[in-house]
Design a protein with these regions (language model features):
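Bacterial N-terminal signal peptides that target proteins for export
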Residues: 2-11
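C-terminal motif of bacterial Sec signal peptides marking the signal peptidase cleavage site
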Residues: 19-22
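Bacterial signal peptide processing site
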Residues: 24-27
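Sequence-level preference for short, compositionally simple segments enriched
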Residues: 29, 73-74, 90, 151, ...
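N-terminal helix-cap/turn-to-beta initiation motif at the start of protein domains
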Residues: 31-47
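Central antiparallel beta-sheet cores of small beta-barrel/beta-sandwich binding domains
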Residues: 51, 56-140
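Amphipathic hydrophobic-ligand
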Residues: 61-68, 144-149, 173-177
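Glycine-rich, aromatic-bearing surface loops/beta-hairpins
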Residues: 150-184
Length: 184
């Protein structure tokens, strides 16, 4: 292999590696010192109102929606377990219901299940942030698509949380869901 071929090969591999690094998410641990500290079972307890939008990958708003969330936590088999009952109402008049079961598996570590979540959502919190990773069965027209979510929540005050979730399929960005939660 000539020196020029070697350099070209090295350059291509380096560009691919740097490109992949640019696609990675931040670590939730980088928020460990941020306040107010998020206690999932404290924030998601009681009634919460949320307002959100879905934007496609170009940034155009495709859907607006509101969510009424009623949550309650208890101890089941020695673990904190939360039931989050979400009622969605979209700007086109359609309605949707999702009931999450969240389990704190260790301090700052969570799993979540819901009827339209494929397998389990895996969550980790630190400081004021929480990151969820999960696959959702998303109905579009007459089809169901399994899409991946990289879901970030940030507690900005004791009653307000901001949520941004990147939605992708096969690693291709499809859009973003943005929500603001207001605890009553």
């Amino acid at each position: 292999m000539s020196k020029i071929q070697y350099l070209k090969k090295y350059l291509v591999i380096s560009l691919i590696a740097f490109g992949l690094l640019g696609c990675s998410s931040p670590s939730v641990k980088q928020y460990a010192q941020e306040t107010p500290k998020l206690d999932l079972s404290e924030y998601f307890n009681g009634t919460i109102d949320a307002y959100g939008i879905f934007t496609d990958r170009s940034g155009e708003v495709k859907k607006r929606f509101t969510v009424l969330l009623v949550a309650k936590w208890s101890v089941v088999n020695g673990k904190k377990t939360g039931i989050l009952d979400e009622s969605f109402e979209y700007s086109d008049g359609t309605k949707q219901k999702r009931i999450w079961t969240l389990v704190e598996t260790a301090p700052g570590k969570y799993t979540g299940t819901a009827d339209d979540v494929i397998g389990e959502a895996i969550g980790e919190s630190a400081g004021n942030a929480l990151n969820w990773a999960y696959t959702l069965a998303l109905p579009v027209d007459n089809s169901i698509y399994h899409v991946q979510f990289d879901d970030w929540m940030y507690l900005v005050s004791p009653k307000v949380m901001i949520n941004k979730a990147q939605m992708s399929k096969f690693g291709i960005n499809l859009g973003e869901v943005t929500l603001s939660f207001y605890k009553r």
